[in-house]
Amino acid sequence: MTVVNKSFLTFLVFFCQILFPLNASALEAPRTVKAWASVLGDNIAETWNEPQHVDLYVPAITWHARFAYDKEKTDRYNERPWGAGIGKSRWDEKGNWHGLYVMAFKDSYNKWEPIAGYGWEATWRPLPDDAFHVGLGYTLGVTARDNWDYIPIPLVLPLASVGYGPATFQMTYIPGTYNNGNVYFAWLRLQF
């Protein structure tokens, strides 16, 4: 057996042990996933049925990471995502934000792109003024694009925000490969 084959075999055995552990925690995983899905479903239902706010979404900027694109492409792309959206949101007993939203905006090709989903952010109020807040979380949703024939595409993306009172600047990053994805997208969210 060559050194490369031995190294590969060692890696394969190690990887399989990580991927397929044979212990009690592996048997608990389905229950953990079920519990997480149950909490997610409850949070979505509570946000839909008992919202504290109606939100207005105003897309502000898209930025294609210059290190991940050919200049010819970024020169042609739209980075002004005109559009609007509406949503429902609430703050839970821990002070974290939950929101349901639907938004439409002009994508990189200046075509309309709808998106709808649920967002959650752990929220901190680091200053003595409780009106100032920052958040980190995620969004689960569905979008559709003109260049993909408006086929619904599920998504899971990170969220981050900074806000004061009812105004929040919220953002995400769409990961990708060279000349695809790697887009920063941000919007203003106003709570009423």
From Swiss-Prot:
Reactions listed under catalytic activity: a lipid A + a 1,2-diacyl-sn-glycero-3-phosphocholine = a hepta-acyl lipid A + a 2-acyl-sn-glycero-3-phosphocholine; a lipid IVA + a 1,2-diacyl-sn-glycero-3-phosphocholine = a lipid IVB + a 2-acyl-sn-glycero-3-phosphocholine; a lipid IIA + a 1,2-diacyl-sn-glycero-3-phosphocholine = a lipid IIB + a 2-acyl-sn-glycero-3-phosphocholine
Signal sequence coordinates: 1-26
Active site: H64, D107, S108
One GO cellular component, as annotated: cell outer membrane
Keyword tags: Acyltransferase, Cell outer membrane, Membrane, Signal, Transferase
InterPro entries: LipidA_acyl_PagP (IPR009746), OMP/PagP_b-brl (IPR011250)
Entry annotated with the keyword ATP-binding: no
Enzyme nomenclature, EC number: 2.3.1.251
Localisation: Cell outer membrane
GO MF, any single term: acyltransferase activity
Residues under site feature: Role in lipopolysaccharide recognition: K73
Root EC class: transferase
Gene Ontology terms describing biological process: lipid A biosynthetic process
Membership in a protein family: Belongs to the lipid A palmitoyltransferase family.
Function as written in the Swiss-Prot or TrEMBL entry: Transfers a fatty acid residue from the sn-1 position of a phospholipid to the N-linked hydroxyfatty acid chain on the proximal unit of lipid A or its precursors.
Assembly notes: Homodimer.
Protein name: Lipid A acyltransferase PagP
Native species: Cronobacter turicensis (strain DSM 18703 / CCUG 55852 / LMG 23827 / z3032)
UniProt gene name: pagP
